[in-house]
Amino acid sequence: MYKSIIASALTLAALSGCAYNVENPVDHVTYRNEPLVDQIKDGMTKQRATELGGPASSEHTLSGNRGTCNDYVLNREGKQQPYYVAFDVNDRVMSKGFMTCAEHEQNVREKSRM
């Protein structure tokens, strides 16, 4: 009984960590050759990221004055996919992924509550 409770708790803990980066791996395969996805790396300057990815569809200030976040819309075969690139206060890429800036901010808020 004790072992099954521990196993269940460990399984739940492992799965809860996955809940914060909800990204479809198919999106990465579909858009992997897009300059925004392929070439933008953590630590890159905002200027260089904008040169590679082009102008963002919108830019947001991150909560807590942590930096800014650019929303992009990737297009392929009639399908639109949101993609965000977040920059720290030094205008360096700190994260990116297949979601909007608003979804990214929500994930950050949920993680900080834990």
Please describe what each predicted stretch is.
Residues 1-6:
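Bacterial N-terminal signal peptides that target proteins for export
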Residues 8-11:
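Regulatory sensory/coupling modules that transmit signals to nucleotide-handling catalytic cores
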Residues 14-17:
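C-terminal motif of bacterial Sec signal peptides marking the signal peptidase cleavage site
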Residues 19-114:
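Residues within mature, well-folded domains
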